[in-house]
Amino acid sequence: MSRILLDTHLLLWAVAEPRKMPPGVRSRIDAAEVFVSAASIWEVSIKAALGKLAADPAELLAEIEPAGFNLLPVTGEHAAAVARLPAIHADPFDRMLVAQAKTEPLLLLSNDSLLAGYGDCVELIARKPRRT
């Protein structure tokens, strides 16, 4: 069974906006052991407080277990691993997710093309095309 770490966008799509999930990704998630980082909940909390995201972090947290996902805490080992990453991406939340993926090891699914520079621990997922 594959082990997957969802980035924040894919987490939001999976639990709040499944219609945005690209074809085939949902079945991969259903067949895998899936992790959600506590850093993603933190990111949603900050962006919601700044008015940049209309999501309730407490509700998102409550949806993790019913969705069949595992909450991955941020450890000291994860934090130290961030320092070993090349400076490909400046976003601290994304850097933490990459560090967790490399440390655990997990495959990080993301729609952020900058993360591809971190190598085979990241797989890019394109958003489902809009119907016109």
Regions of interest found by a model, annotated:
Residues 11, 41, 79, 115-116:
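A generic structural signal for short hydrophobic patches within well-formed alpha-helices
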Residues 15, 39, 74-77:
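Generic beta-structure capping elements
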Residues 1-36, 49-62, 66, 104, ...:
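Short, well-structured N-terminal submotif of metal-dependent ribonuclease cores
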Residues 57-61, 65-114, 125-127:
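Active-site neighborhoods of divalent-metal-dependent phosphate/nucleic-acid chemistry enzymes
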Residues 36-39, 96:
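Aromatic- and histidine-enriched alpha-helix N-cap/loop-to-helix transition segments
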Residues 119-129:
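Active-site regions of enzymes building and remodeling cell-envelope glycoconjugates
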Residues 44:
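Phosphate/NTP-binding elements of NTP-utilizing enzymes
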